[in-house]
Amino acid sequence: MVDRNSKYRKGSKIVINYFVLYFNNCCIHGFRYLTDSMLILFEKFLWLILLVASIYFCIIVCLSSIDRYYTKSTHIGIERNYIFWNTTLPSVTVCPVDRLNITYFADFCRTNGIKGPQRDILWDFLENLANSTYINFQNIPQNEQIDQIIEDIGLKPEHYTELIYNLTYDRTYEPNFNERIRCMDGAMFIHVRQVLTEWGLCYLGNSKLTEEYSSRYFIFGKYPEYNKYEYENIRLPYQVGSFFQKDTQYALLGFKGPAIIAFAHSAFEVMKVDSNSDYAYDGVLYDLSTEEITAEDNLEQDTTVAMRRCRFPHESNLTHFPFYTRNICQQECRINLAYKICKCIPHFYPNRIANPKPVCDYKTLRSCFPQHASFFLKLYEENGNHENPATCYCEQNCHDSVVTMKSMNPMSGAKQLLGGIGSAVSVKTWPQSRLRRQVIFSLTDLLVSIGGTAGLFLGFSVLGFVEVIYFFTIRIVFQILGYTL
């Protein structure tokens, strides 16, 4: 028992002597006064109070710097050197009212033995299904004949969109120039593609989104095929303008149906299903203005999503979509909300995921969705009928633009003059300021701030930190082994 106490006292003395050795030799101000034999107890106590206070305030200020780094390291500033800018024109998405191709449909009916009145019933059903969205699901026809036809051809809900796609002719690949859907600025061709939206298959022009946003990629996971008719001509991926161009415009043309539905939106975004032009029988001419939101080149590398509170397109955290925009994020919110309320999702959403959600049959689209249409579109309800409100937060786009509509007018005489209808975008005035996301407190600033704080309160430095590591790792090992340094 005595030997054990003796060993304990001896070990405690060694530990105390080692800390005294460190206090006498460390570069942190004030520690050596705690072990100085020349000072009386009151002086040592005074130095201890000063050291505790300095360490406390050093930690508080350092934590404040860390909090600033993670929560306030970026801001949105204003730039005004507008004479050096090129501003991207807004995008336009056009959805034709007549979706199906009569030739493809005839071949499908011939292959599946659909004749006579059944053929007309199926055509009407598929056209309404292809044009259906949250505001008009109730217009999908329902009767026993449709049920019988669906049963005969073995059409399952998860194949609705694939069938509509196969019966729709992508007229951006039309050899005849006058029949082709094209996006043009005078003699210059602008890239246009077929996309799958919440209003079915539509056409998008002047977009800065990647080719992953296309109907073929959403449905089959394949990029759009090479369009030789577009690449044979002088082609722009998207149209830009500058302050010195007083009137810049382009048109998305070639629609032969009785009417179209058009959406004008940011070139960095997708259309919103509730921001359409209604049915336009002569086409739509938009007079718009736009103000871009840009980002510093180092914003992505120097910050995380939580720090900058925005996402770049390739930083998708979504399940159904391979890229990110705020409107796409809200579409995923609608997917989850529809699945929660109606136990299935509409047919026009991409569903190529590890665990696909069940797709609604047309009867569920008619019965469940119309009564919740406002909730699905707004993602909230003013009267609060639903027990569990939609919990959906979508970060902003790091690159974006604010599009303001000055006017929206019909393109009178477009059918006679151009042989079809479409939508045109005109920008007559250019912004003299734009917003820019900037890093104002980088990791280097954080290290300088912490180092300056530690130096101010404790006289601490990088070498002081190395000294602590050295004393309590390498030196203590040698002390245990019995070596003297």
Located regions from the model:
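Non-transmembrane functional regions of membrane and envelope proteins
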Residues: 1-485
